[in-house]
Structure formats: C-alpha cells, structure tokens
C-alpha cells in the first residue's frame, strides 16, 4: 500500500476523527498536536496556548483509493472555516483550524478548495482557514484517541453543546454531523 498523510486542525480533535474513520482509503486517524515549537507536548501544555501547537488529526491514506481532495471535502464539513480564533466554544490558539500541507500538491489543492468554497458562497463570511507547511505532529495521549468510541455519550453531548453539530447540519445537512 502506498501511503500519504494529511494533517488537519479544526478545533477540538475529538470531533475531527469520526468523520474520516469509515471513508474508503483512510487507514488511520490519530489525534495529536501540530505546528508548535515544543517537542512532545502534553495536552496540558498545549492548552496554555504557549507551545504554538493546535489540536489536529493526522490521517494516513492510500492515494490509490482516495485523494487529498476527497479528504478536504470531508474536512471542510467538520468545522467552521470562517473562524480563525478557535472553534465554537473552544477559543484560543490551540483550537484554530489549519491545513498543514505535506507537499506542493496538497498546498495547491487546499488553496483551490478554499477558493471554491468562497465562490460557492456556502458560508456568510469568507473561508479563512490558514494553509501552512507541515512542521511536526505529536500523537496525543491515549485517552484522546478514538474519543468518540471510548466516550460516546460525552462525545455526542460535546458536539451538541458546543454548537458544532448545529453549525454543520445548517450548512451541510446530516453529513458528518
């Protein structure tokens, strides 16, 4: 199997895993921290907003089965791409959305997707999700991995209570909500 990586941030990483897990060609989705200047940060360190990291997921995928463009289609249906100050009731640097590109193809695909979404006028405000070069990724602690499976009741309550589920459904219907 050929494999590539997509590293994407969209607020709380708990909500960024489930939409990707059953999609063909996706081999794994790992919650973690990306983009910062501290090696192997902990959740507590990242939450201080002093490490430069954002909560993110790293997706391993088979490019012969699915494309980075398909992953972006899913990604943009999981968060509010018009808010760069955090997501829903999670505010601050560690919850900012970011696309971390691994190569020029991913960079161009991300730029095109942002432009396409802005032209389609799906959102009332412009899509402003930053596109940055991939720097690093550190897996989060075990209790954060597959959170939606380990804590389904809390996961569902979090999605509803934060406003994420309502936002996604208002823009995309029940897709990925």
UniProtKB/Swiss-Prot annotation:
Q: Which reaction does it catalyse?
A: L-methionyl-[protein] + [thioredoxin]-disulfide + H2O = L-methionyl-(S)-S-oxide-[protein] + [thioredoxin]-dithiol; [thioredoxin]-disulfide + L-methionine + H2O = L-methionine (S)-S-oxide + [thioredoxin]-dithiol
Q: Which domain of life is it from?
A: Bacteria
Gene3D superfamilies noted in UniProt:
Peptide methionine sulphoxide reductase MsrA (3.30.1060.10)
The disulfide bonds in this chain are none
- An individual GO BP term: protein modification process
Glycosyltransferase listed as a keyword: no
EC assignment: the record states 1.8.4.11
Pfam families under this entry?
PMSR
**SUPFAM superfamilies reported in the protein's UniProt record:** Peptide methionine sulfoxide reductase
GO MF terms listed in the record are: L-methionine:thioredoxin-disulfide S-oxidoreductase activity; peptide-methionine (S)-S-oxide reductase activity
Active site, renumbered: 12
Top enzyme class, one word, equals oxidoreductase
Which keywords does this chain's UniProt record carry?
A: Oxidoreductase
- Give the protein's function: Has an important function as a repair enzyme for proteins that have been inactivated by oxidation. Catalyzes the reversible oxidation-reduction of methionine sulfoxide in proteins to methionine.
Family (UniProt): Belongs to the MsrA Met sulfoxide reductase family.
What is the name attached to this protein's record? Peptide methionine sulfoxide reductase MsrA 2
Species name:
Staphylococcus aureus (strain Mu50 / ATCC 700699)
């Amino acid at each position: 199997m050929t494999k590539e990586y997509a590293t994407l941030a969209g607020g709380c990483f708990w909500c960024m895993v489930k939409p990707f897990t059953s999609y063909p060609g996706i081999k794994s989705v790992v919650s973690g921290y990306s983009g910062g200047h501290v090696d192997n940060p902990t959740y507590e360190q990242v939450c201080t907003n002093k490490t430069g990291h954002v909560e993110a997921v790293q997706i391993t995928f088979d490019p012969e089965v699915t494309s980075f463009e398909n992953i972006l289609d899913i990604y943009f249906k999981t968060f509010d791409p018009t808010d760069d100050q955090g997501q829903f009731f999670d505010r601050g640097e560690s919850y900012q959305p970011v696309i971390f590109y691994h190569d020029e193809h991913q960079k161009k695909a991300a730029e095109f997707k942002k432009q396409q979404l802005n032209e389609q006028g799906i959102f009332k405000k412009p899509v402003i999700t930053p596109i940055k070069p991939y720097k690093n990724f550190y897996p989060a602690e075990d209790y954060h991995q597959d959170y939606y499976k380990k804590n389904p009741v809390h996961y569902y309550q979090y999605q509803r209570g934060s406003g994420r589920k309502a936002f996604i459904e208002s823009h995309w219907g029940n897709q990925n909500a």
